[in-house]
């Protein structure tokens, strides 16, 4: 219908939608990732779990709004999580379960724009998944992020491209599922060696906020050039600055968030021209701003360095 689209097909989006698909691809292409096993039966998964060292890493195969992963040393918690996945309580459908090796190291996210001819690096970030301060509590869709990641060097980026991204793009082409769009690689770095944790086939939330404020209007050039398979002619400049975003979430998130709360009287924002507020779970009712539960806003600041950006966002 003559509509320009920059994004993967449904088949290519399996890179995010099915962890078992991506893990099996890694095995086939020798892409560095954690060792793993895939289970279709609850008893088999729990039996295997008891043979593994802690902490356990358990994942629902399908999409789960950022809540389909458990990292825990508690066998009872791990058992309950497995049971919930097979019962269809976690994720969109009754899912297979992946139990994988816990990878030591520091995590980061690296982002690429990809068309049928070209792979372009467009930025990096680090995010915080746990609900509470000091990286504690259950996993969420993301409670904050900053960009760029100080872990990423030119040498490490080269390794990520050659050992992870290029083999992935090759595999998708070989299997008739050629990828185009934004590819977000969630990685762990240990002794200078990157390993793949997972893929998203989009920017991610809240990573999108910090990347887009730093890319500025270039984001539109990326979209249009990518949709027309012209990324090779595009020069992308990563700004020499930093951005940070902090999520404001409803009490009880992610397990039992309240909803329909009126926000007008409780939001006291100290204005700063560097601050951008992105709405998530909000709506207007009778001229009052209300929430739908879960993540409500992200407060995002771009500044000359991360320390300044962090100061401004928390003062706001």
Q: In which residue ranges do the predicted regions lie?
A:
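A short, GP-enriched loop/loop-strand-helix hinge that lies immediately N-terminal to
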Residues: 1-17, 30-40
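Short, charged, surface-exposed secondary-structure boundary motifs
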Residues: 14-20, 132-134
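General beta-strand structural signal in soluble alpha/beta enzymes
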Residues: 5-8, 35-38, 56-60, 71, ...
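Active-site "cap" helix and flanking loop/linker of ATP-utilizing ligase/carboxylase catalytic domains
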Residues: 160-183, 200-274, 280-285
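Short amphipathic alpha-helical segments
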Residues: 66-68, 244, 293-299
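Generic C-terminus detector
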Residues: 285, 291-316
């Amino acid at each position: 219908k003559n509509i320009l689209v920059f994004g993967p097909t449904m088949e290519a989006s399996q890179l995010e939608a099915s962890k078992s698909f991506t893990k099996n691809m890694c095995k086939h292409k020798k892409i560095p990732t954690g060792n793993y096993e895939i289970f279709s039966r609850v008893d088999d998964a729990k039996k295997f779990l008891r043979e593994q060292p802690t902490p356990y890493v358990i994942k629902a195969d399908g999409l789960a709004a950022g809540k389909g992963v458990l990292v825990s040393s508690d066998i009872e918690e791990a058992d309950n999580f497995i049971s919930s996945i097979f019962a269809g309580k976690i994720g969109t459908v009754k899912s297979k379960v992946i139990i994988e090796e816990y990878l030591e190291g520091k995590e980061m996210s690296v982002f690429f724009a990809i068309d049928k001819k070209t792979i372009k690096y467009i930025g990096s970030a680090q995010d915080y998944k746990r609900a509470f301060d000091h990286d504690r509590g259950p996993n969420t869709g993301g409670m904050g992020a900053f960009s760029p990641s100080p872990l990423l060097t030119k040498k490490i980026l080269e390794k990520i491209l050659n050992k992870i991204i290029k083999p992935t793009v090759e595999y998708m082409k070989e299997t008739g599922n050629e990828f185009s769009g934004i590819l977000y690689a969630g990685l762990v770095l240990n002794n200078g060696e990157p390993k793949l944790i997972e893929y998203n086939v989009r920017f991610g939330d809240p990573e999108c906020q910090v990347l887009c404020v730093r890319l500025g209007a270039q984001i539109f050039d990326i979209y249009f050039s990518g949709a027309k398979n012209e990324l090779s002619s595009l020069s992308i400049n990563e700004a020499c600055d930093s951005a940070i975003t902090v999520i404001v979430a409803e009490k009880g998130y992610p397990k039992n968030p309240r909803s329909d709360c009126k926000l007008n009287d409780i939001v006291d924002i100290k204005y700063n021209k560097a601050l951008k507020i992105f709405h998530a779970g909000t709506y207007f009712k009778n001229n009052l701003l209300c929430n739908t539960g879960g993540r409500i806003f992200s407060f995002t600041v771009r500044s000359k360095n991360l320390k300044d950006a962090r100061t401004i966002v928390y003062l706001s």
